[in-house]
């Protein structure tokens, strides 16, 4: 199995856990590797029931209408929470939007890669760590990522104007990645 990651940083956490990795870009911008796939990386919580850095072993991926794209057994990650992931095409940082998505789909968290992996027909499971919650959003970091999944220079500039908030968000992301590599080992 290959742990498919959006970023090199997520792939480093997966390799630390002893997994073979492939980096496909945010929102899956590169070809998927051959064989069985595991969606591995960060996710944003859609409700307050999930904590920062909580690790999820998802058993279901749904689309924006709540339709199941993939369903399977958990991978058995010790200490992980079973969850449903929502496949999205952009970061949802607004707490009100997150609540609506949770109510409409029943999903616990959202990410931008699991949907494409589910549609490939080769997804075996999803291991994700919560990087942000409705109470502790990504803030400036979310602005750095444009709607197309690419780095936005305008967003980087805005994040630079809010260094404390950016530092807090980055700290939460680092903590989630650390937990992901520890729990998955």
Residue ranges and their predicted role:
Residues 1-185:
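Glycine-rich phosphate- or other oxyanion-binding loops that anchor nucleotides, phosphorylated ligands
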């Amino acid at each position: 199995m290959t742990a498919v990651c959006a970023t090199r940083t997520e792939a480093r956490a997966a390799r630390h856990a002893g997994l073979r990795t492939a980096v496909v870009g945010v929102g899956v911008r590169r070809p998927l590797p051959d064989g069985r796939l595991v969606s591995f990386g960060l996710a944003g919580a859609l409700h307050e029931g999930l904590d920062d850095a909580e690790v999820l072993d998802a058993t279901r991926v749904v689309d924006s209408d709540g339709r199941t794209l993939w369903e399977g057994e958990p991978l058995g990650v010790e200490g992980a929470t079973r969850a449903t992931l929502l496949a999205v095409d952009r970061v949802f940082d607004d707490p009100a939007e997150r609540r609506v998505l949770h109510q409409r789909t029943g999903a616990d968290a959202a990410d931008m890669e699991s949907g494409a992996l589910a549609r490939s027909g080769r997804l075996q499971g999803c291991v994700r760590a919560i990087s942000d919650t409705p109470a502790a959003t990504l803030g400036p970091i979310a602005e750095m990522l444009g709607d197309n999944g690419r780095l936005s220079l305008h967003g980087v500039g805005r994040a630079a104007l809010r260094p404390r908030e950016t530092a807090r968000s980055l700290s939460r992301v680092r903590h989630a990645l650390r937990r992901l590599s520890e729990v998955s080992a």
